[in-house]
Amino acid sequence: MRISSIIPCVRNANGSGHEQRRQTDDPGKDEVNRMNDFRKTAQEMLEFIRISPTCFHAVANIGRMLEAAGFQQLQEKEEWKLEKGGRYYTERNDSSVIAFVIPEKEVGIRGFHMAAAHSDSPCFKIKEKPELTVEEHYLRLNTEKYGGMILSTWLDRPLSVAGRLAVKNGNGIEGRLVNIDRDLCVIPNVAIHMNREMNKGVEYNPQVDLLPLLADVSFDEYDAHTTYDAQTASENAEEQPEAVEKPTLVALAAETAGVDAETILGEDLFLYTRQEGKMIGAKGEFVLSPRLDDLQSAFALTKAFTESTPAEYINVCAVFDNEEVGSGTRQGADSTFLEDILQRIAEGLQADHSSYLRWVADSFLISADNAHAVHPNHPEKADPANRPYLNGGIVIKYHGGQKYTTDGISAAKMKDYCERAKVPYQTYANRSDIAGGSTLGNISTAHVSVSSVDIGLPQLAMHSAVETAGMKDTEYAVRALKEFWGE
């Protein structure tokens, strides 16, 4: 299925895909320039998230970033012809992407240098038969939870709908991205007068409390401020304007995508919050944005990847879908996607299976999924010794139960990359009495057995509709990853 959409390319301020370092003889000016680099990268990241309301949009935007840097898209169902120095990428389901760069020298390739993030974030997915009416007045959207979001953060804020449409055309079924780019709906709270116990804690029922209000089906857009009864309207039908077709989600999506509603045979639509990311804090030292988990890491990986040239390793950048719901899909980390692509790379370079296995044995994976920073109001929730902070640099994550793949050797490698890039790093481990979440690393390495480290960028309010992170940390990740991918 081919995706068709017009998506702006995310670029640096100078219009290129590459960053130019500025150096002067004035240490004060150098410090200003370094701070400007941090802010510029953070702003680019926020813009990337703004134009990526769903996993489909994120992957399409990553594709645009890759193509701006000279990458060629390959289709999995076609034969590949790979060349030394080639820069390639392929997508699966329009929601996962793997890019790779082959060194200029084919002889002496040592292995794969890989990093992975994910394209999805917790949100509400819109069900089939998406519209529910209440007492012939309200039109609600029929939704379900996608991932483990903080439910209360989705209430009483402007929301909209985006995703992918499956459109029938003369050549079969075509995927079409859609984003209803306006304040469209809201999930309203119950007033405190109707629930006096609300501030003591509310357990939200997703089928009852969390359905978005989309429209008033009784609304007359010709005479919105006049009330008249149905009998009077019927008696004076000839004097009334022609009835307007009531708004529906499919009609809105079709209009936005520029297709006939009758040609839409399937949808993958999600709610997203309309709040745009911004820098906040007394000195602009924080970033506030939806979907920082994990589009902050996905952006940092892509930016570093497009600005790197390998020497002895094949560089690989993977952004998987469905991490928030277990990764168990054909486009998730718990699939053969990564393994399939690595094997096809080896075949395209005429490497035999023994050579491929030797490459895998000398490979390394960085799994990048954001990490919990120490919370200012609840510092006791963090481990007493491993305490990452916003703007403190890359977080190396450890777990005795192997939910994170980090071990002593892989941690040492990551620390070395950070030190060579002059990037600070921190460590994270769960409190021993608090269970943590899972991520990509151990799932990916179950299919491709390589040494791996789990890292993340520190953030607060993970899985909230809007999350908080450090302004400096995206640039820190870019610098460390460029060091890794430069080998």
Residue ranges and their predicted role:
Residues 2-14, 18-487:
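N-terminal hydrophobic/helix-forming segments and targeting peptides
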